[in-house]
Amino acid sequence: MKTSMFLTLTGLGLLFVVCYASESEEKEFPKELLSSIFAADSDFKVEERGCLGDKCDYNNGCCSGYVCSRTWKWCVLAGPWRR
């Protein structure tokens, strides 16, 4: 009886860990997908776009009129809806 309870609890714990790991991977997938879509090589950039879609961080800022998105880490248009 003790062994079966131990195996049941161990199995439930393992199931929890596997589900948590797969869920965290699913949360990262959209960020990686969008980053790869908007990652542009410097040869293909159009001058009209300026900095839109460029990778950035807080040390390496964006062009004027653009801000670094906290979530996606690329330059986006600045606007009143941005925090």
Swiss-Prot record:
PROSITE patterns: HWTX_1 (PS60021). Residues 1-21 form the signal peptide. GO terms for cellular component: extracellular region. Residues 22-49 form a propeptide. Coiled coil: none annotated. InterPro entries: Huwentoxin-1, Huwentoxin_CS1. The keyword Cytoplasm does not apply. Pfam families: Toxin_12. GO terms for molecular function: carbohydrate binding; ion channel inhibitor activity; toxin activity. Disulfide bonds join 51-63, 56-68, 62-75. The keyword S-adenosyl-L-methionine does not apply. Keywords: Cleavage on pair of basic residues, Disulfide bond, Knottin, Lectin, Secreted, Signal, Toxin. It is found in: Secreted. Expressed by the venom gland. Belongs to the neurotoxin 10 (Hwtx-1) family. 51 (Hntx-8) subfamily. Hntx-8 sub-subfamily. This is U5-theraphotoxin-Hs1a 1. It comes from Cyriopagopus schmidti (Chinese bird spider).
